[in-house]
Structures are given as structure tokens and as C-alpha cells.
Amino acid sequence: MSRTDDKTLRESMYIKPEAVDPDRHITAKYYVEGNAPMNKMAEEAAIENSTGTWTLVGYETLEVRKKFGAKIFRVTGSNGSGFIELAYEAANYDPELGGINCLLSDIAGNIFDMKILDNVKLMELNFPKYWLQAYKGPKFGVEGTRKAAGIDEKRPIVGSITKPNIGLDAKTYGKLAYETALGGIDFMKDDEAIVSPKYCPLEDRVTETMAGIDRAMEQTGKKVLYAVNITTRQDKLLELADKAIQAGANHLMVCGPYIGYGGLQALAEDPSVKVPIHCHRVGHAAFTRSAKHGIDVAVWSKLMRMCGADQLHIGSVEGKFYYDEAETQRNIKALRVPLEHVKQTMPCSSAGNRPGNLGVSVKTLGMDMMFLAGGGVHGHPDGSTAGAKAMMQALHAAMAGIPVEQAAKENKELARALPTLTLAH
């Protein structure tokens, strides 16, 4: 068998940007750094991410590389850092058998471990129409979530996170749910740290929490959604979802990075799951936070949307975790931008939200949002009912364009919250 020389094979990998076919190619943009010319880094990445390996092999003919190999269509930068853009043959990856899991194993796999690349970050990922059509996306999305919460106006959803994170028994959960729901919020959820410890079994927690919510609704007339955390091994997700729903849950929650794309997709697409899915991003920063290495959070969020997240966490504007405004806006765009038939995912802000910063959060992030507070509700000096009321008072002030300090003059719960619920760091 005659082999094509390396130079000819490498030359075959370059195409002009106008040759990229949106109906045929999956395109990816990477930031790269390394001790080599940009084109050399692009070539090695394209080879590793498609047909090639560390040496030429007999059956990797020129025809194979031309037909199935990754193509380089744009390289920018110099002095060992910049951006490379590659077009992958979508036919290499079946969107349903293998799907996102297989795709990322190739185009966002070994590239992170290559010696020639000191740093690499996947910044953008775009799909042909037929690939997107294979993903059903959220069942509820933004408007469906509002409807499920009984909200008939275009406003953010405000909710609470049960605190302390762990350590409460089911009866106490129910008591806290009742107290919080009395304050008029729309939503409450488990902390990501709890699923079903022996002192607070999931089914008991759901039963007691929903009983507390129902008791509050008898007084307020207001529906409240409760997202119960069912994060578990993938083959047990549907079983746990069924147990939660049978116990009365009107919402589910999962930790996206740890159940994976396939776990979320299987849960969201199952016809037995007729409630929204709240997706926490806990753990995402392990691969998204570095500006130079990993996967951009907007790419990850886009994939979570495709796989069926009805709501997805994006961090908070003035909170306790890392925040970058440009990154956050890029992330929100990934959840809202038109994507064929796929519904919008509702962005969820949490981690340091409180009555005093809700106004700036609404102004920065918009109305099609969910804002959650844990300590910002339960840390209120007068208790969780007052904390929930203060959050709703802050929301109404923000929507009316009234400064929170002014609104506090007419709302005692808000007035009590402002001097005490502040972040020291």
C-alpha cells in the first residue's frame, strides 16, 4: 500500500471559511497557547481530533483525510497564542447513538492533554440543523416554567434554597417550607448537597415539604414550585424521579456536571417526567473557570439546553462566587438565542442573592430570569417568612424602578433585611 506523504496530508486539511457547510459541518473555535507556530498547533489539533494519530498509518489515505478529517478554516494570533477554528464532518458522529458524549470525546478530549498545547479552551460549538433536530430540549423552558408557577406576567421568578444545606430532618423541611411559602415566593429547591440521607429520606422530605407548601397556599392562595434534588447514578435517575413525583413533587432538580449530558437528556425526554427540570451547575468551574483552559461555560450551557434543562444556574451579579460580566452575558445568550425548535432555558441566578442586590441583578440580567436566595431569605433577622417577603418586596421595587432604600421605607421586612443581609467578601 502506497502512503501519502505527511506534507500532502496536512495541506489537505485547509479550507477557506466560505467552504464551511453549515448543513454538513460541526464547527468549533478554540483558544490555544503553546511553543509552536499557530498553524502547527492547528494542524496537530485537527489531526488528533479526527482521523490521525502521532504517526502516519496505512489506511489513513488522502481520501480518508479529505472526506472525514477535521478542516482548518481560520487561524488568528501569533507568538504562540491565538484562536483556531475547525470544521468537523458531522457524519462522523450520530446525534443519537453516541451523540454529544461521543462528539466531545473526540473534539474536546485528547486535545486538552497534547504536549504541543500548553493551554486550550473550547470557546464555541455550532451544529448543523439535523443535529439540533435530534435534541428535544426543554419541555417547559422560560414560559412553561412561569406557567407551572402560576405566574401570568413577564417577571422574574423568585425563590429560596433550603438552608442549612444538610442536617435537617423531613419534618423540619416541611416546617421551613411552610414558613418560606407564607412569604409569597414562587419557588423553592433543595440544596445540591442533599438527595436522600437516612435522617431525611427523599420521599419523606417531598411529602413534608409539599404538605407545608399546600398549608401555606390555603392562606396565601399562591402556588409554589418545589425542586427536589434527585442527582444520582444515571441508571437510577428515572426511578428516583418517579418516587419524587409519586410523593407529590411538582419539580425536579439535578446537578448537571455530575449526571452528565446523557443523564439529563434521558430524564428530560422520558414521557413519564411531566414536571420541569432545574439544573444546577455545581462543579462546572473545574473545567470552565480558567480563561485559558477547558470548556467555555456558554458552550456547556448550550449543550445542557439541548439536553433538556428547563432552568440552569449562571451565578450571581454581586454574590459569593466568581463573576465575569462578559462571560455571564455570553452564557445567558446561549440559553436564549434561537436554536431551531429548542425552547429557551430560563437562566437562574443564585449564590449571594439577597434583597439588597436584587435590583441590580434584575437590571443587569433581565426579566426572563429566576433569582434564588438561600441565606438571603433564611438569614433574615425575623425569620424565613420575613426573608421571603423582603425578596418579593425588593423584586416589586426593581420592576417599578424604585431604589431599594426608598422601597424599604414602606416595607418593614425589606427595611430589616438591608442592614443585616450583606456580603462581607
Would you name each region that the model predicts?
Residues 30-36, 156-174, 224-236, 283-297, ...:
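Active-site mouth loops of central-metabolism enzymes
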Residues 49-50, 54, 200-228, 261-283, ...:
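Alpha-helix-loop-beta-strand connector modules within alpha/beta enzyme cores
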Residues 384-425:
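Extended, intrinsically disordered, low-complexity segments
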Residues 166-230:
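Internal metal/ion-chelating core segments
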Residues 239-242, 247-373:
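Catalytic alpha/beta core domains of metabolic enzymes, predominantly
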Residues 138-149, 194-216, 234-237, 256-274, ...:
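Active-site-adjacent beta->alpha loops and helix N-cap segments on the catalytic face
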Residues 1-182:
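N-terminal capping/small domains of soluble enzymes
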